[in-house]
Structure formats: structure tokens, C-alpha cells
């Protein structure tokens, strides 16, 4: 289902006596006497964080999670980040989750953060990575992945509710292996912003908490005390900051009850399974396998990749100039949301990598309005792009020719932050880690579980991840996954004096890349149902014909230097298949009653194979979607709070096809 895209309304700031004042909430962001000292006293000391951090285990898999209800100027985050690096164990990781319905525009944020030069190091990095302010979840990483920020833009209750598995407090705590360790309840005062202090929000906070979870807030309101108490927290008395008489500290004790109206059957998640060791086997050495290996290795896991070819990045990930661009839409659906979230995260990842490796270029790309349908689709974005020019700009024929460097027959949509990446080289970089072992020439035909670990070709690990593209449903356990093969052939042609002027990728019915090593990559065929990568001359001619339609005024070489074909794997809904793998027969039995009511509450998690996960079917957008999907999956395996909302976890879940079949019938 889709609905119109509703943009974020940014904060309306009025500067009074050089202090930021919210016109939406008729309240000040911070007082002249407050600022850093108030944040330190209320939130850091109120949650006893420094003492707790100093007692943490010293390993990469350990994550301390702080959640905040109002991001505001980001000061709390920056101060916490600075103190974490000073007092926490070197290898421990901080996950900071925050939310804002009306985030600050970047210029306002910069002005606010100039007030605290002692946080300038952290502030500079936050500003550099500050996201495009689109609704939903934004995941940012800092300090070599030691600090992560999940910034949720939207209504605080809706955003945090999406972090729940099911919304039933008893089952939620049975399923949950990851909890918030400390809460910063920071928002405009209860009298000015009641939604930030609602009973429903505190019920969600309780479901994301465990017995050691603490809460701190500057407020001493009886409304807040009552709401926290009703949610299962024990209130502790503490003097307020400065002249303020009181503030609230609390710790979570026990669950009481939750509304039956907001429960969701957790068909997408399994009951926790013990992992005796942090070891993982990954079948498949393409982009998906290499990204998930990298994400787990950064968390301290020992990873082994089994690849049937002679090196990584050979199959569908062998494109040396893979194009990165989003699928923009004025409508919000699981597909368009996942594509946008993924593009923004991937762009951040690749920008960081390009600082150290010559992997490609992110100088933009041009999606040509090559027919009336595409032109209409692009024109429908005009108001959306006025709000988010960082994502795309509509250009006419003259502008498109200037941007691309060559004469073009039409305008289009310029995506300024996109470009191309060398996928095989990226794979090599991702697995360059002492915790990652690669075994090549290793074809996997069966997988086995010995009641403790997974065993594949004589190699044993506690976790198994199937990232082998179109072959992912070759096993007995996975044969219910509806994966289709799509063959694509790229053609390499000699560059000419005229064609070398092309500066950015051009995409239309096909696509062409800027010259690299005196040649252009042109593509690509799209043969659904073809699972063999044999090369053929006809596809080269079709690619050249597409090229001529893209830029008919350019004298393109007809000299084919090389060609390459790969097999993409895709699902029926063109979203990837990522997450725990369900047992098909048991799933159908447990959830059979969904047939009569698809929204029926069933108090059972999905029956999944223990510690078996799928990470496949990324289609032709793997470069865009794989980084976020694998980072989420690594977090799930490592028992971390999700960086994706529940609705998107369900949208990419391997169980979605079984559920759909139950509801719709054979």
C-alpha cells in the first residue's frame, strides 16, 4: 500500500538574545545558564553513565544504547559522544537513538553548535553527516563505527513504536534481546508539547527497557511522574539543575500491561536462540556477502566466506562501474521508503570510503526523460524536489547537456550525490579484515545443523548467512523463497575524442558510464528467467542501439572491446530478502488463522531455523540497498536495537511470502 509523501516540517527558529526559540512550541531550546552543564547534570549524571561505562566489557560486540525523545540542537548527543570516547572501553560501541518531529535546518544547527566550542570536534563531524531531512529513519556512523546515531524524523510515538517487535509487553520482553540502557527524556515542557510526555509513549519506552534501564529528565511534573510509574518505573528523588528544585530520575522495575489495540503479530521475527560463539559462515562472496562479513567483523565476529568462484565480486557483483541512484517517488510505500533510506545511507558509506580508496566517483548522474511516461514521472516530483533539492533537480535539455558534458536530446532528473562504484574492488576492500577468512572454489550444495552449530562443507559456525544470490533457494530449507534470475549483459566500447567528454552516468532505457581507461561501459540487457551468464553478440548490438538513443548526436565507437554478463537475483516485489529464515511448514500451521483475518493477533513469533539468515535478491539495485540491509542484519545477529522500522523489516522479511500465501491462498 502507498500513500502521499508528507514532508518533514523543519523547526521554525526565532533567535532572541542570541538564543534559539521554537515558534512551533513557544519554548526555548536551552537557557543561557543551562547548555552543556545542564545536559551533563541531568542526563549523564542522572543516568550514572560514566560509572556504568567504566564497568562495560572490553569487546567490539558490546553495545551501549541511549535513546532520546527530542534531538533538538544535538547537544546531548555530542556531549555524550565526547564523554563516551573519554570514559568507555576503547572497543565498546555506543548506539544513540533520537527523534525529532521538527528538526533544525542545517544552517540553524550550525549556528546553535557554535555556542559550544568544547564540542567543536564532534559538531564538525555531525554537520558533515547531517542528513537530508526526509521523514523516517536516518542511520549515521562516526569514529570508525564506534559511535552510531539513529535519527528518526517524525512523531515520537510513531517512530519509537516502530522499534517494537509486536507491541504486547509480555511477548515483547520474551522476544527482545536488545534494550535501551538509558533514556534521555528531553523535549519542550509537558505544558507546551504534551505528545512528548504521553502515557502511550511511556508504555513503548517500558517495552524497550529492561531492569537495569534508567531514565533521566529535567522535568519534575506530576504528569511525568505518574506516567513513568504507570509504565513500571520507580521514581528517584534528585535536586534539579541550578535554581530548579527537582528533576526526575527513574529505573525500570517491571511490566504492567499494554494496550491490546496496538499489538501486531510478530510473524517476521523469531524467538531468541543462544549463540555460544561469535562465529559466522557466509555462503556467497558478492557485495551482499562481503558487506555482511564486514559489518559482523567490525562487531568482533569471526567470519568465514565460502565462495564458489576464484575470488569475491565475480558473479552478479562483477560490474566495475555499477551505478548508484535512488528510486524517488511522491508516494510513500515500503518499496520507496526502503529505497530512499538505503540510498541516503549508502551514499554516506561510499563518500567515506572514497576518502581513502579510488573506488569510483560520486559526481552525480542523470536520469533522462527519454519518453512521455518517464517525463511525467519526473514532473510529478517537482514540488517534492523543491523541498529536497539535495536529492534531485529537474533539468531541461540545455542543462542536461551542460551537466553531462555532451549533447543530449532531452532533459531529465539530475541526482547530484549519485555516481558509480567499482563493485569487485569494493568487495576486496570490505573483506580486508583480520577477522574475515575467505575460502574460494567452494561450492555449497547442502547445509546442516548439528543442534548447536551450522556445518557447511565441513566448516562449522554458530550463525549461517545465505548470501548466494539466485542460488539462495537451492536448499531444502529455502526452496519456498520465490527468487527469480535476471541476466544482464554489459558491453565495453572504445572511447572517442567526443565521447570522453561525458562526465557522469546517463540512464534511460539503458545506461552509459564516463570513460575509464579509454573505454565506456554500456548496458544492460534484462533477461528475466535466464539463469546462465553466457555471452552473446546480439546483446552487444542491443546495448549499442540503446546507447544511440541515449545520445544520438554523439559519434560513439562501434568497436566492442569486451563484454560481461551477470545474473541478478530478484524477488516478486523487487525488495530484497533479508532476515531470519522461517520453517515453511511450521509457519503455515502457526499462522493459518491469518487467512480469515490478516490483522489477527497471534501471540507467537515466527518458527525459524536457529541462527539461519538470508541476505539476497537485491536485483539491479544492490549497490544502493545492500549497505543498509546488511548493517541492519548484523545488528540483529549481534542483539542490537534495530536501525530500521518494523514495517520495513517486514517488507524485506523472508517470511513475507509465506504470510501472503496464507492470506491470499494458493
Curated annotation (Swiss-Prot):
Subcellular location: Cytoplasm
GO cellular component: cytoplasm
EC number, as in UniProt: 2.1.1.61, 1.5.-.-
Cofactor(s) needed for function: FAD
Known catalytic reactions: 5-aminomethyl-2-thiouridine(34) in tRNA + S-adenosyl-L-methionine = 5-methylaminomethyl-2-thiouridine(34) in tRNA + S-adenosyl-L-homocysteine + H(+)
Principal place of residence: cytoplasm
InterPro entries in the cross-refs: FAD-dep_OxRdtase, FAD/NAD-bd_sf, MnmC-like_methylTransf, SAM-dependent_MTases_sf, tRNA_MAMT_biosynth_bifunc_MnmC, tRNA_MNMC2, tRNA_S-uridine_synth_MnmC_C
GO molecular function: flavin adenine dinucleotide binding; oxidoreductase activity, acting on the CH-NH group of donors; tRNA (5-methylaminomethyl-2-thiouridylate)(34)-methyltransferase activity
Keywords recorded for this protein, A-Z: Cytoplasm, FAD, Flavoprotein, Methyltransferase, Multifunctional enzyme, Oxidoreductase, S-adenosyl-L-methionine, Transferase, tRNA processing
Spans through the membrane: none
GO BP annotations, alphabetical order: methylation; tRNA wobble base modification
Highest taxon in the source lineage: Bacteria
Region entry FAD-dependent cmnm(5)s(2)U34 oxidoreductase, spans: 283-666
Segments for region (tRNA (mnm(5)s(2)U34)-methyltransferase): 1-253
Function: Catalyzes the last two steps in the biosynthesis of 5-methylaminomethyl-2-thiouridine (mnm(5)s(2)U) at the wobble position (U34) in tRNA. Catalyzes the FAD-dependent demodification of cmnm(5)s(2)U34 to nm(5)s(2)U34, followed by the transfer of a methyl group from S-adenosyl-L-methionine to nm(5)s(2)U34, to form mnm(5)s(2)U34.
NCBIfam families assigned: MnmC_Cterm (TIGR03197), PRK01747.1-2 (NF002481), tRNA_MNMC2 (NF033855)
Similarity section: In the N-terminal section; belongs to the methyltransferase superfamily. tRNA (mnm(5)s(2)U34)-methyltransferase family.
Name of the protein: tRNA 5-methylaminomethyl-2-thiouridine biosynthesis bifunctional protein MnmC
Organism: Legionella pneumophila subsp. pneumophila (strain Philadelphia 1 / ATCC 33152 / DSM 7513)
